[in-house]
């Protein structure tokens, strides 16, 4: 495909995505592991959703939260990965103006929704381990419903201005985005307007939301750890530490990659441009692939539910 020049001053109706500028010839090979991860993420999350829906014994607050996390993972994967694979396989690099900013909105809002869901799940584990006698009265179906509304409303409303601000910019610096996906940073760099407000709002809101969630997650697991260390039975202690430890490591991976992405964007002149592009893609693949395994499949009730589901097929 012949790409337009980035010196064009004509109105922009579509953008062109350039994946891995330095490794164009490797894209077909890279598509193979990405496709496998995509299929794993979609299959694992879909299986978890179907299992929880069909198994009456799993109609409990914890599993409703797992369903919410799986739904967010599926939407994030479908927003990003099919377009990336279409570029790799069919050289379909163009993306319309509205589709690009819809992608910006979904990525910003759903990533912060996922962070907020992690925080609520950490609170759920805190109540279960630190206040077990009060669990059934605190973590109710009504609590989960209110939490889900909070997750969607807080993050959807606060991240909505990011694509709105970007879509109102004048794009006279070209059409070519040096990325596989429409991120706010890569798109707004093409504008000939001042993007200070745009970039500042995303930075402040993004890290306020993610930072507050992370602080509450760390506090929850700190109190969980204190309680677990008081458990007398070594087997029970090891089981609790193993479960909570794997949860916390997954959350740490989620936030660490976001932090690395921010650092690479700030120091982009010193870092190869393909590094943040790859991190962006992996961040939309690895957590969705691991979440149902770490949070769901390792749970005895989920395993039993999947076995029951397979018997019905």
UniProtKB/Swiss-Prot annotation:
Intracellular or extracellular location(s): Cell membrane
Cytoplasmic face of the membrane: 55-67, 122-146, 225-246, 298-313
Gene3D superfamilies: Rhodopsin 7-helix transmembrane proteins (1.20.1070.10)
Cysteine pairs bridged by disulfides in the record: 100-182
Keywords: Cell membrane, Disulfide bond, G-protein coupled receptor, Glycoprotein, Membrane, Olfaction, Receptor, Sensory transduction, Transducer, Transmembrane, Transmembrane helix
Keyword Transmembrane helix: yes
Membrane topology, from the record: Multi-pass membrane protein
Extracellular topological segments: 1-33, 89-100, 168-203, 268-276
Glycosylation site positions: 6-7, 184, 198
GO terms, molecular function: G protein-coupled receptor activity; olfactory receptor activity
Transmembrane segments: 34-54, 68-88, 101-121, 147-167, 204-224, 247-267, 277-297
GO CC annotations on file: plasma membrane
Signal peptide coordinates: none
Family: Belongs to the G-protein coupled receptor 1 family.
Function as written in the Swiss-Prot or TrEMBL entry: Odorant receptor.
Name of this protein: Olfactory receptor 56A5
Lineage: Eukaryota, Metazoa, Chordata, Craniata, Vertebrata
């Amino acid at each position: 495909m012949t790409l337009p020049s980035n010196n064009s001053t004509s109105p922009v109706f579509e953008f062109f995505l350039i994946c891995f500028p330095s490794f164009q010839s490797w894209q077909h090979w890279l598509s193979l592991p990405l496709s496998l991860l995509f299929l794993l993420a979609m299959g694992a999350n879909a299986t978890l959703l179907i299992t929880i829906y069909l198994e009456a014994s799993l109609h409990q607050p914890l599993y409703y939260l797992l369903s919410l996390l799986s739904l967010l993972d599926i939407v994030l994967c479908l927003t990003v990965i099919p377009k990336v694979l279409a570029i790799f396989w069919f050289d379909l690099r163009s993306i319309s103006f509205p589709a690009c900013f819809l992608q910006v909105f979904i990525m910003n809002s759903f990533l912060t929704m996922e962070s907020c869901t992690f925080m609520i799940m950490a609170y759920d584990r805190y109540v279960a381990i630190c206040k077990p006698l009060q669990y059934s009265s605190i973590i109710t179906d009504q609590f989960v419903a209110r939490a889900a509304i909070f997750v969607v409303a807080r993050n959807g409303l606060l991240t909505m201005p990011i694509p709105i601000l970007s879509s109102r910019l004048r794009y006279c610096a070209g059409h070519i985005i040096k990325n596989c996906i429409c991120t706010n940073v890569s798109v707004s760099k093409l504008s000939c307007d001042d993007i200070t407000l745009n970039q500042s709002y995303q930075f402040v809101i993004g890290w306020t939301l993610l930072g507050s969630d992370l602080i509450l997650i760390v506090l929850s697991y700190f109190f969980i750890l204190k309680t677990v260390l008081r458990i007398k039975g070594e087997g029970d202690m090891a089981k609790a530490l193993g479960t909570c430890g794997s949860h916390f490591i997954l959350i740490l991976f989620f936030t660490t990659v976001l932090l690395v992405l921010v650092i690479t964007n700030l120091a982009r002149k010193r870092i190869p441009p393909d590094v943040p592009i790859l991190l962006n893609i992996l961040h939309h693949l690895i957590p969705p692939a691991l979440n149902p395994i770490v949070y769901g499949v390792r749970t005895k009730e989920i395993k039993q539910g999947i076995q029951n589901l397979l018997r019905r097929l």
